[in-house]
Design a protein with these regions (language model features):
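Transmembrane beta-strands of outer-membrane beta-barrel pores
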Residues: 49-55, 84-88, 95-101, 136-142, ...
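Outer-membrane pore/translocation modules
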Residues: 99-222, 264-268
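Short loop/turn motifs that connect adjacent beta-strands in outer-membrane beta-barrel proteins
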Residues: 32-41, 85-89, 124-131, 182-191, ...
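Outer membrane beta-barrel transmembrane domains
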Residues: 54-60, 64-67, 208, 213-317
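Outer-membrane beta-barrel biogenesis signature
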Residues: 25-58
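Surface-exposed strand-loop-strand hairpins of Gram-negative outer-membrane beta-barrel proteins
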Residues: 52-75, 105, 161
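Residues on the lipid-exposed face of transmembrane beta-strands in outer-membrane beta-barrel proteins
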Residues: 47, 78-82, 117-121, 134, ...
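Transmembrane beta-strands of outer-membrane beta-barrel proteins
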Residues: 43-47, 89-93, 117, 130-134, ...
């Protein structure tokens, strides 16, 4: 962790509220296998960069409050999926290969973020697509970053509010419904529609207090959802682009009291958000693609009140 060059001052108390945004933040633009599973051997790879900057946070009562400092998160992410068994099994992987958290002029932490493995199976193929998934969260990030040898209590406290992971293994069960339509004489536009719902089983998060002792937090389960509409225009060159509107959300079952505790610990229990997003995905050449998108929460608690920018390059083969 890089230490500050100036004293924290009174606003630091409010900066502690940033912790949940650091532990989880606003989820990046959604990526998953969805209802269209891959054929055996068919592979999709994506490398992405995302950035969020904020000077405000959604507090435990859903109001927007100032942080008292500027926060930035930069992340290098990876997503992959590969078909294993026709219709019945597609595997996915996603995670942050490198995550950099910064409180401007105060300190920063960096390292590997949390990872997630997914296993998807097809349930229905016609007239709509329906798939089910099991998603396994791996706590590979650091839930208790160190300020380094010889750091004082204040430096250690800053480091603890800038985790790269939540220290908690978890499991999510998800259903994904999809349908593609259009490209007809009376309606030449091409569309796809996806609706997903999941139940997120949370477990116990592990971290360390300022004295270095192990501490544990029981996470409350959550309901997750995603709705997405993609549109492609029937014009030369423009038919290489998908224009995507998206709504995503997490509704934690934690009480506001529980959420207020974790807003000051960075472990992420109680995180709730409803966010809208827009993305443009382009096919450049054969299986090579590029994408850029934005998303932002309009209702949330314990999440940074800022816009998340994500760009990515993908390869399908």
């Amino acid at each position: 962790m890089r230490r500050a060059r100036r004293p924290l001052g009174p606003p630091f108390v409010r900066v502690l509220l940033l912790a949940v945004a650091l532990g989880l933040g606003l989820w990046p633009l959604a990526a998953d296998a969805g209802p269209w599973l891959r054929r055996p051997g068919n592979t999709y790879l994506q490398l992405s960069y995302s950035r969020i900057a904020a000077a405000r946070i959604f507090s435990p009562d859903f109001s927007v409050q100032p942080l008292g400092a500027s926060y930035e998160q930069h992340a290098l992410g990876a997503y992959a999926e590969v078909g294993l068994i026709e219709r019945w099994l597609t595997a996915s992987f996603e995670g942050q290969l490198f995550r950099y958290n910064l409180l401007v002029d105060q300190g920063a932490t960096y390292g590997l973020g949390d990872l997630r493995l997914g296993f998807w199976t097809g349930l229905v193929e016609k007239p709509v697509r329906l798939a089910a998934a099991v998603l396994l969260g791996i706590p590979s990030g650091d839930s208790s970053p160190s300020a380094g040898p010889g750091a004082d209590a204040e430096g250690t406290l800053i480091a603890r509010t800038l985790p790269t992971g939540d220290g908690e293994p978890d499991v999510e069960l998800r259903l994904s419904l999809g349908h593609s339509f259009g490209r007809a004489r009376r309606w030449p536009l091409e569309h796809y529609l996806v609706a997903e719902a999941g139940y997120w089983f949370r477990t116990r998060g592990r971290s360390r207090d300022l004295a270095g002792n192990l501490s544990f937090t029981d996470f409350s389960d959550a309901f997750t959802y995603r709705a997405e509409l993609g549109t492609k225009l029937p014009f030369r060159f423009l038919d290489r682009f998908w224009f995507i509107l998206r709504m995503t959300g997490v509704e934690s079952f934690a009480s506001s009291i529980d959420a207020s505790r974790t807003c000051a610990t960075g472990l992420g229990n109680g995180v709730t958000f409803n966010a809208y997003g827009f993305e443009v995905a382009a096919r450049i050449w054969k299986g090579l693609g590029l994408s850029i998108g934005l998303d932002s929460a309009f209702r949330a608690r314990c999440v940074a009140a800022g816009v998340n920018l994500k760009t990515g390059v993908s390869l399908e083969f």
